[in-house]
């Protein structure tokens, strides 16, 4: 908008139905696996922000078997293993940064692990959050974002 804030539109039910039908048709026609259904921001996080955090990825996964989504129980299992008092310090160290950069790369994000926080890393985390944690997309690898990432890697190891 004119103030420099990002504004993301809501997707109404009619749009979601049309998106699902179109994506299903294209995926079937070209034999695209459901796990390869991605958004611009997943592919080019430093340049693209669409479809944004309000895009209904979870609904497309649950209702139409499109895309990827994590299992809540698996996420919770990873989350309960985290020690809150040390997590932030661990993840802000070079080893921690390298660890989560590598995890994002394992899931398919085009990030080169360096052990340093840079704009590319922040934008990649933000894109990941748009897709899998749309309630909070600040580009910070916090405990919940890490738990979701681990749950996805466990569910989709060959991604």
Regions found by a protein language model. Name each.
Residues 53-80:
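Acidic, His- and aromatic-enriched active-site or binding-groove loops in soluble protein domains
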Residues 81-85:
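C-terminal accessory nucleic-acid interaction domains of nucleic acid-metabolism proteins
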Residues 23, 57, 101:
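Generic structural marker for isolated residues within well-ordered, non-membrane alpha-helices
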Residues 29-41, 113-116, 137-140:
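Surface-exposed patches in mature extracellular/periplasmic domains of secreted proteins
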Residues 37-51, 119-132:
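Acidic helix/loop microenvironments that form the catalytic cleft of cell-wall polysaccharide enzymes
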Residues 86-158:
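Short acidic, glycine/serine/threonine-rich helix-capping segments at coil-helix boundaries
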Residues 5-8, 48-51, 55:
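A charge-rich, low-complexity, intrinsically flexible signal that marks solvent-exposed coils, linkers
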Residues 1-38:
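Long, well-ordered alpha-helical scaffolding segments within enzyme catalytic domains
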